[in-house]
């Protein structure tokens, strides 16, 4: 149904609309399938509302704001964009990331002041990192809490709590529900289910 002039437009309609509920139903009743496809087009509601004297408008958005996700490649691109925004937020708020491209922080994570995140760090879920911590490299914490001034390296932990001034790792495994008390050094190859490696 597009005209030649319409085909030359290099913008797209993302199909994201915000309507006043009391205006939408009457506008929908004015739609008709008078097109090559014989279908009702939601896009026609804009012209209907404008014809009824209502104010309508469009917002131009940057491409990353509106990119579609139809396959895993596009999902990876969208995740990269979101990760860059999240990392930028933390970098502007006093967190040091040695390599932001290799640092993964979920939206629900909370990070204190003067924290350093080394490459390969993944903080997921509702993880909370206290002030002055060093996390990583190659550390994954999910729904875990780390107290102030602790250093956690090459460690995996889920639903765990690490106290303040602790030294965990390298190569530590913290089982779900485990607690490392304040000031404890676990040593290398620590497994909270079996104790230190011998």
What role is predicted for each listed range?
Residues 1-84, 88:
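Catalytic-core segments of class I nucleotidyltransferases/pyrophosphorylases
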Residues 90-93:
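A eukaryote-biased feature capturing mid-to-C-terminal, repeat/solenoid-rich segments of large proteins
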């Amino acid at each position: 149904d597009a005209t030649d002039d319409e085909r030359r437009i290099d913008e797209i309609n993302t199909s994201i609309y915000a309507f006043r509920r009391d205006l939408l139903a009457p506008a929908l009743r004015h739609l008709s399938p008078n097109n090559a496809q014989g279908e009702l087009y939601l896009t026609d509601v804009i012209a209907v509302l404008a014809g009824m004297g209502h104010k309508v408008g469009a917002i131009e958005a940057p491409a990353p704001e509106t990119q579609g996700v139809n396959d895993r490649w596009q999902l990876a691109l969208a995740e990269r964009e979101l990760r860059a925004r999240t990392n930028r937020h933390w970098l502007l708020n006093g967190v040091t990331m040695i390599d932001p491209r290799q640092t993964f922080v979920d939206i629900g994570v909370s990070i204190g002041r003067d924290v350093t995140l080394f490459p390969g760090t993944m903080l997921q879920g509702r993880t909370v990192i206290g002030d002055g911590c060093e996390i990583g490299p190659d550390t994954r914490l999910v729904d875990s809490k780390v107290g102030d001034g602790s250093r956690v390296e090459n460690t995996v932990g889920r639903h765990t709590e690490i106290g303040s001034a602790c030294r965990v790792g390298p190569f530590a495994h913290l089982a779900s529900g485990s607690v490392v008390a304040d000031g404890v050094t676990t040593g290398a190859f620590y497994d909270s289910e079996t104790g230190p490696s011998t």
